[in-house]
Amino acid sequence: MSNQLTINGLQLPASYCALAAKYEGFDGFCNLKLKNPKDSFGYPLECELAQIYSNEQKLKEITDSLNNYFVPDGYYGELDSNDTDPESLKDITDFKKIVCFGIAGDGSQFCFDFRDCANVPTVIWWEDDHWRKISNSFEEFICLFSNS
């Protein structure tokens, strides 16, 4: 994997490309555990980074499939569906500026969110029934894990 990678017109962070290259020979399986059970903002976080997508084809395939999995259905995509959880983001219904880069052990997605900044995406995670911002950057995100 090169140190520059663009998916759907969005350039992924160089630090992500370096980590993906490190685990490319393992098909992206990294099984990184949290150092502490908290996200970059101090909120509780219980997950691990099981796999990162280490090739462009897989990144594009998984990213393009997000629109098929997260469809407004009367609950998901409704304006007030997650208003009770202060850590949750509004349901995403337009994934043009989202790139899925990995999964936790339970299959929940880790994604880059380029909606607010095209140069430094935040990291969001699908937590059971809502999206949640867990880091301001990939560099912050990867510092949450041991052996990265």
Tell what function each PLM region has.
Residues 1-108:
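A surface-exposed partner-binding patch
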Residues 124-148:
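Compact, glycine/acidic-enriched structural inserts
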Residues 119-121:
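A short alpha->loop->secondary-structure connector
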Residues 26, 114, 145-146:
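Alpha-helix boundary/interfacial micro-motifs
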